Amino acid sequence: VIATEARAKYNAQQRAGDHDIYKGLTFWAPNVNLFRDPRWGRGMETYGEDPYLTERMGVAVVKGLQGDDPKYFKTHACAKHYAVHSGPEWNRHEFDVTVTPRDLWQTYLPAFEALVKKGNVQEVMCAYNRYQGKPCCSSDKLLIDILRNSWGYENIILSDCGAINDFWQRDERTPRHETHPDAESASADAVLNGTDLECGNSYKALIKALKEGKISENDLDVSLRRLLKGRFELGMFDPDERVPYAQIPYNVVESPEHVAQALKMAHKSMVLLKNKNNTLPLSKTIRKIAVVGPNAADSTMLWANYNGFPTHTVTILEGIRNKVPDTEVIYELGCNHAADFVIQDLGNHITSPAGQGFASEFYNNTEFKGEAVYKGLASQLHYTTGGNTQFAPNVNLTNFTARFTGEFEAPETEQVEIKLSGNDAFRLFIGCLLYTSDAADDLI
């Protein structure tokens, strides 16, 4: 489903002449690192700490992304982050991994080997950290001895974003490896050890490295051939009529079949650990339910990270209200995501005729003209289009306006702080007072 929709979007964007970033056919997934440290904030991308489960899931994802056509790949999958990279995040740009050979071969490498040999993965991303003193993106042991020579991998290796900069840049705020004197030495070493493509800007120095004799044109041609081969096998240089995936129409994106499949996957991927007093499924006879927590009414938080952008997200709060429409459902933030103090959110004291929250009105123009195309109840005002996400049904992705109206009754007499930020112009009315902002990312 993901690869099909990716191809559909790519086809439409190519025909529109849109070649911008994030609109290609390379997916930097799956993440087959092992989630061994709960402090690692990106652990939700992985399949846990079991090497066998990670291998099986990873191979399935690769095959699904890359398709089964005998000549062309649907998209490119990418095994990351190679290797021995499982957090913590804060020192990844300087960390030198120490791991026993047994742990390396039995724990950290099996999933990568399986993706290469069983999944035929087309890209591998080398990690930020060092291994045995060398940055992973210039490690002859990891990239040449194991990946290319032992496993027979002949496809693209690319760096994690900014990883080559860690070789040579000096930064007091962010300690780095500092294993190389300059960008040209770092870039040449990375290419010579198999890193064909950089996410970053250090490879600009390859021209100088070539002139200084640190690398040859023949060395560069090795990587160039791999990169061009990858593009040819995606069908980028062939007429659309010869590439079966180029025929996928845009209307498959979020089609009823795909939405049903996504819902099925969500159902089957959940595990109910406890159901005290048979609380679930929720009974429609319950008179009052309190929903507490910062993620309950936050659609963007539910997307996680490095995610696609759905046209609509059902928050936990919305889902509960939809399940028990006749039950009084109150919401409380409860706590912050991360802070050394607690902010008491008074948003649950904002009401409108429709209930707790703001009455919302959306117009498909920039002047509030005509009738609203959507009217509803907004429990929270944390919105982002993300390029594809509608604020409400039937509302344009761009060039629309919205009005949110509510009445705030303070629970007690005290000083209240109201914060509002946005990346476009907005106006805030408090009673008869007007506060305006015309600047991007402004805060009042």
Residue locations for each model-derived region?
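Aromatic-lined ligand-binding clefts that engage carbohydrates, nucleic acids, or primary amines
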Residues: F408-A410, E414-F429
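Conserved small/polar residues in nucleotide/adenosyl-binding loops
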Residues: Y435-A440
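Glycoside hydrolase catalytic-domain context in secreted enzymes
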Residues: V1-R403, E407-E409
